[in-house]
Amino acid sequence: MAPTQPQTKVRKPPRSWDALTPPLAQWILDYLSSMGFTQPTPVQKSCLELFRGNKDVVVEAVTGSGKTLAFLIPVVEKLLRGEEPAKRNHVQGIIISPTRELATQIYNVLVSLVKFHEPSAEAISHAKSDEKRPTATQPVVVPQLLVGGTTKAAEDLGTFLRLSPNLLIGTPGRLAELLSSAYVKAPASTFEVLIMDEADRLLDMGFANELNRILGYLPKQRRTGLFSASLSDAVERLITVGLLYPHKITVRVKSLKDGGIIQERKTPMSLQMSYLVTPASQKMPAIVQLLEKLEPRPQRSIIFFSSCMAVKYFSRILGAVLPAGFSVTSLHGKLEPKVREKNYERFVNTTSPMVLLTTDLAARGLDIPQVDLVIQHDPPTDTKVFIHRCGRAGRAGRRGLAVVLLQPGREEGYVQLLEVRQTPITPLEKPAISVTPDEVERVSAAFRSQALADREIFQMAQLAFVSWTRSYIEHQASSIFRIADLDWLDLAKGYGLLELPKMPEVREAKIDRSLGLGINTEEIPFKDKVREKKRQEELAKWKEEKAKRAQEENTGDKRKKNEAWSGKAEQEETKLQRREKKRRKREAKKFSEMTEKEKEEHLKLEQMIEEVRKRNEAKAAEERAAALAANPPKPKAPVKKVDDSDEEFGGFDD
């Protein structure tokens, strides 16, 4: 009989999913395989080892490191490990997110995961039914999404009672509101786990009160996971209140700097972060070249702007100059929730090259797959946001490029500032970008022609430029981003302006607001015939009132020649009051005839201009006070008072 050969034990790769202890369920491995995730990221490996072992965790990891699965897998395992299903209307887990987009994204990832767990997939299939979900015979994961803008609070409660979910995912306000209902129960005997995702942003957005309310509804004996890209003092205080003896997980990426020095990076190695120095008028032509020349051609690109109005404006006009095959969509905080959701889904699911124009709304948390290119048209006012903007590309090991556009001069100092903050960026070398004067004129002319054809676009351009100026003034790195160093004419060309807005900065610079174009902007019509008809009627009234005022003033001038000096000051004051009253009346009437959108934009513009005016007045007052302190006026010589009390007139002599 041949001797039995000893069996060779197959060793599993140390970084594979199979190597985790305890091992993952087979259905979870099937999901990971179907998604192409061959091995866990460092944050996933560290988190799964601790969080699955009944320990609270605080996870600080770079953007795009795979935090979502790092907490979803342990949460699902905790909810399924019981012997019996959760009682009806009893919540076992909660995931808090700062924005509806991020909450929706987490919900969708969770649904795609638990579809591989047959009992949970069967339970979730009843989500769209009007009848109550049948009671499960074994533990399942049934999530409910709670975000504002799509449903009302009463509808959320109705869905909860019908579906009986055991895992809630949503924004702080909606979660706190649902938990306040007597029908929603989260006792210590049932509740398992709380997740706070993007915790620093939750606090930055002012959700501290809602978080405290939520914590008040939950038992202290629970597992808690706090996930964030950075840990601020406010987050540390939240950790003290919300977690018991947490284990801190910090995942850094290290790269070799010139000279062989190892330095920490706050972004994945797969992400290249670069800068391009270019005048304002060349920014858009440079973006067009970047999209044309980048190999392979970017499928999904994101361009960040400093304001909602800039996103709104450029999303209307940029399509005219983009390379063939590219489309444009937008995402910002002023959009209706349903429009935001539609645009987000359109960008995520696009099958052709698309450019998303957005504000810092999309800078954090949104895990948009396969973003190839991020361009920062405007550097963020808060340098901490820079890294999160860049992190939209190069996620989950995919190669990505992030480029920030800087104007020549002081703005180039932004590179050194980022290096000090452990966010080094390098000059963009590939693809080589070289913009000619002809390209600048072509792009600017394309923008201006659209503004000439539609007054709505002309007005958008004015509002966008004012809001950009406001954000530039408020930049934290004010020594680098100085309003006094700006080339207003070059900026106007970059925005495709037909005239500069009425702003104190433009007035102080003593620039011709017409830009030498010789365009009468009052004659630019609305494409919408109804709006144009209304505008013409208002314009006719205004001209009539102006002529009437001029006639009244002319008549008044003639009367002045024959008037006595006495009483003129009082008459002038009365006239000014009457004139101001008429002006306010006209403004009120004009405002009342505006659409809600026009009213909102008008108020924004007035508020912006007023804030800028106040700041400039305050600055001027400080400068006058400083000048007065440096050169105080000489004191005047005292006037000697003559005492003539003894020389009182006593009458004439006889």
UniProtKB/Swiss-Prot annotation:
The keyword rRNA-binding does not apply. CDD domains: DEADc_DDX55 (cd17960), SF2_C_DEAD (cd18787). A motif (DEAD box) lies at residues 197-200. Residues 48-249 form the Helicase ATP-binding domain. It holds the Pfam family Helicase_C. The Q motif is unique to and characteristic of the DEAD box family of RNA helicases and controls ATP binding and hydrolysis. Belongs to the DEAD box helicase family. DDX55/SPB4 subfamily. This is ATP-dependent rRNA helicase spb-4. The gene is spb-4.
